Amino acid sequence: MDLIPNFSMETWLLLVISLVLLYLYGTHSHGIFKKLGIPGPKPLPFLGTILAYRKGFWEFDKYCHKKYGKLWGLYDGRQPVLAITDPDIIKTVLVKECYSTFTNRRNFGPVGILKKAISISEDEEWKRIRALLSPTFTSGKLKEMFPIINQYTDMLVRNMRQGSEEGKPTSMKDIFGAYSMDVITATSFGVNVDSLNNPQDPFVEKVKKLLKFDIFDPLFLSVTLFPFLTPLFEALNVSMFPRDVIDFFKTSVERMKENRMKEKEKQRMDFLQLMINSQNSKVKDSHKALSDVEIVAQSVIFIFAGYETTSSALSFVLYLLAIHPDIQKKLQDEIDAALPNKAHATYDTLLQMEYLDMVVNETLRLYPIAGRLERVCKTDVEINGVFIPKGTVVMIPTFALHKDPHYWPEPEEFRPERFSKKNQDNINPYMYLPFGNGPRNCIGMRFALMNMKVALFRVLQNFSFQPCKETQIPLKLSKQGLLQPEKPLLLKVVSRDETVNGA
């Protein structure tokens, strides 16, 4: 039996030509950085340098920064990605040329109605949505929303106290994941849930399903390797996000809006109500108002952007405080002095908490919420002698920047004093980017910080945290997607008092 098929010469020629064309398709973009004299790891056909991510984004970025310096080139499949760490170039990308050249983030494939979400929308549509949503995130609006968040800190303390009384190691992700989910569903959808104690709640189940995202998911990989498939998937109504989940949230928002329009009494002030109000505000005189579908898209993206990041950031803070008891004690002293007798925090009180601010900032330096920032170059451009071709993804490796010893002496050390008022002027704003910078920074930054600080205030009023034998020291990070611990972060929770106010 012949192992080699008995094809005609024409068939063999066609097969060879097809294979050559396929190879050229999978490699033709891989010479861009070499031509420009930009160093970087060697790409593989079709895959580019994507296999290096198996070791984890963050360590890979640190490795490249150390090996190649301020500039290096990667390939996510066929997509050229230029990593930059020079603060002047970063400023140009995020601020100076944001509107003209670096407006948009990368398109990661078919996302359905979430194309209308502020984090994903592009160009003029993004500008319109940003203008309509910006009044929602002012300090005045957040102050009005503060009581909603504060009520969930009581639930947080109760859940934390249960772990303390049982004397077992407590999973920070379980506790803060529930808190984060409860706050986001309350503020984005107007729905009150107790996700830790009611895991079967439909909202809880749908949110958890929404957040099951893997960078090595077949659909994600297929559009990364073959981006021309994205329009086909969109035409077939295929999305990266489960359709039943999006339909559930869409129905929920529509029902909630209808109920609120019928009710005459004053509505509670949450993101959903503020977006509904924006449909009739003066802002829409200069911008087309948010549609109902756009409101759904923003509500869903708030969950996607806020749940994992907030719960992980809070877990990181308490891990660092547990292994640095002197810093934990100093922060508790500040909290006790600000509001004795375990009184609830107020919005204005949190603004005056200098050491709390320092601790949160230093935690976000070590574990930035956005481990990478990205912008797509819309036209050929040269910045500080670096030529960037149209279509290149410009990537800022925040995690690596925050560990650069040139800007951060002993970068692996946890030192809140780096962010004291005395030292603030020494910090380059383009080397500290936990929420990005410029016109397209994280619109929810103030909300995220408020959410984190009020939670920390309440738990540190009532508890102290200690490492236990199950605590992973030093902490290892997950190799999958978002910046989070590799294993569940377990700590011993010790009650500071026999009575817990408000819980």
Swiss-Prot record:
Highest taxon listed in the record's lineage: Eukaryota
Task: Write down the InterPro entries for this protein, in alphabetical order.
Answer: Cyt_P450, Cyt_P450_CS, Cyt_P450_E_CYP3A, Cyt_P450_E_grp-II, Cyt_P450_sf, Cytochrome_P450_3A
Name its cellular compartments.
Endoplasmic reticulum membrane; Microsome membrane
Question: Which tissues is it found in, per the record?
Answer: Mainly expressed in olfactory epithelium.
User: Into which EC class is this enzyme placed?
Assistant: oxidoreductase
Q: Give the Pfam families listed for this entry.
A: p450 (PF00067)
Chief location bin: endoplasmic reticulum
E.C. number(s) listed in UniProt: 1.14.14.1
Q: Does the record's keyword annotation contain Zinc-finger?
A: no
Which chemical reaction does it catalyze?
Answer: an organic molecule + reduced [NADPH--hemoprotein reductase] + O2 = an alcohol + oxidized [NADPH--hemoprotein reductase] + H2O + H(+)
What does the record give as cofactor? Answer: heme
GO cellular component annotations of the record: endoplasmic reticulum membrane
**Membrane topology (UniProt):** Peripheral membrane protein
| Molecular function per GO | estrogen 16-alpha-hydroxylase activity; heme binding; iron ion binding; monooxygenase activity; oxidoreductase activity; retinoic acid 4-hydroxylase activity; steroid hydroxylase activity; testosterone 6-beta-hydroxylase activity
Q: List, alphabetically, the CDD domains matched.
A: CYP3A (cd20650)
Q: What does this protein do?
A: This isozyme seems to be implicated in olfaction. Active in the demethylation of erythromycin as well as benzphetamine.
Which family is it part of? Belongs to the cytochrome P450 family.
Protein name as annotated: Cytochrome P450 3A9
Q: Which organism is it from?
A: Rattus norvegicus
What is the taxonomic lineage of the source species?
A: Eukaryota, Metazoa, Chordata, Craniata, Vertebrata
